[in-house]
């Protein structure tokens, strides 16, 4: 065994100047057969993390590019969004999302903390629920793009602290009371199989570190992406909108962070035509201030709704609802077009001069889109849900 290990290390060292490698018994079992099949030539896939020994996670016969994919997951309280990436090219293959199955046990994170405290097997139930949801999501996105789960070697998570703890099976009850201590605030790299995620058996999970309190890895990722500290003489306010809003105020290299519960209004819940951000969801809205006619963009279609090619190109995904960014723009555009008064109430057809404004049961609504399958309107209750959301975020800011 020692001689074989030395030979393996010498081959990789001499060919690629990589010092020292390791691999699991599962990978080692296939080595001899794949060497012979490849005429004594093989291609290995190495997983390498700084300050660790490189690990062989896959072997192919001969000399070829090993299909290698990774998944980035935003684990939200209401929805789970996944982006599939080709690790060889760095290109994004596709995205997909599902509702977080934990929502049946509580709409927000604090209700899930309460569930863990009140139910004997509450933590295990919530952990199993989210792991099953992640496995379903990765299976669906892999199937959609014709990729084997065995070709996915890394999965990266960002989440708020409570979702982070529930993912790892860590009791979050201490996060339900001051001073909100985290069990783990650093990054973590573990085998996917150790927490029940079904990918390649040698694949790894990497969790982005949380900042602290209720400001999580999702907010940390926003800072990494936007890098507001580079804008030396500018004050920047960043808001990560979700069931919890995380707010970051940056001035030079000083960055202040806080979070507040705001509810799931912008993630598909509490909005009459609301849905998560997925193909078919209206994500952009513009309303002509003179004609009061809307135009919009749908996730999965490049054209605006007033362009000629829209009807043909949108047929594959359809128009199914409106997501968070869409409802924000719709409310703003309705106000600019004179469809809303200062209190956020939708005017009647006579008041606005638009037949799209209709009255029903002593309340008004604005028709955004309709066809023979679906009718999507913005109602006064939708406006109120958005106002409650933004007031919570504004108070925190």
Locate the predicted segments by residue.
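Gly-rich Lys/Arg/Thr-decorated short loops/hinges at beta-loop-alpha junctions or inter-strand turns
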Residues: 108-123, 199-206, 370-385
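Hydrophobic alpha-helical scaffolding
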Residues: 120-128, 209-215, 237, 269-272, ...
């Amino acid at each position: 065994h020692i001689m074989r290990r030395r030979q393996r290390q010498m081959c990789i060292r001499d060919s690629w100047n990589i010092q020292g490698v390791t691999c699991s018994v599962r990978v080692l079992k296939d080595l001899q057969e794949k060497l012979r099949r490849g005429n004594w030539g093989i291609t290995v896939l190495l997983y390498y993390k700084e300050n660790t020994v490189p690990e062989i996670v896959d072997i192919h016969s001969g000399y070829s590019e090993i299909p290698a994919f990774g998944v980035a997951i935003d684990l939200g309280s209401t929805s789970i969004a996944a982006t599939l990436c080709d690790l060889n090219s760095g290109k994004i293959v596709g995205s997909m999302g599902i509702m977080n199955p934990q929502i049946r046990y509580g709409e927000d994170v604090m209700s899930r903390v309460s569930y863990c405290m009140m139910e004997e097997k509450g933590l295990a139930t919530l952990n199993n629920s989210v792991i099953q949801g992640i496995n379903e999501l990765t299976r669906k996105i892999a199937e959609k793009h014709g990729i084997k789960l065995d070709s996915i070697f890394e999965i990266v998570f960002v989440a708020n602290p409570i979702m982070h703890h529930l993912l790892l099976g860590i009791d979050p009850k201490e996060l339900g009371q001051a001073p909100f201590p985290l069990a783990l605030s650093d990054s973590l790299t573990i085998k996917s199989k150790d927490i029940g995620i079904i990918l390649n058996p040698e694949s790894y999970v990497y969790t982005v570190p949380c900042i602290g309190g209720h400001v999580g890895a999702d907010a940390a990722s926003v800072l990494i992406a936007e890098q507001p500290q580079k804008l030396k003489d500018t004050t920047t306010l960043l808001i990560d909108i979700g069931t919890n809003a995380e707010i970051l105020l940056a001035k030079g290299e000083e960055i202040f962070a806080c979070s507040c519960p705001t509810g799931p209004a912008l993630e598909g819940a509490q909005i009459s035509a609301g849905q998560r951000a997925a193909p078919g969801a209206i994500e952009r809205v513009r309303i002509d201030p003179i004609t009061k006619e809307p135009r919009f963009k749908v996730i999965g279609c490049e054209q605006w709704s007033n362009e000629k090619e829209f009807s043909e190109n949108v047929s594959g995904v359809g128009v199914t609802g409106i997501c968070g960014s869409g409802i924000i723009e719709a409310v703003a555009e309705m106000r600019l077009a004179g469809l809303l008064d200062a209190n956020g109430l939708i005017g009647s057809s006579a008041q606005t001069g638009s037949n799209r404004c209709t009255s029903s049961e002593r309340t008004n609504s604005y028709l955004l889109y309709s066809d023979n399958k679906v009718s999507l309107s913005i109602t006064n209750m939708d406006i109120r849900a958005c106002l409650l959301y933004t007031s919570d975020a504004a108070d925190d800011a």
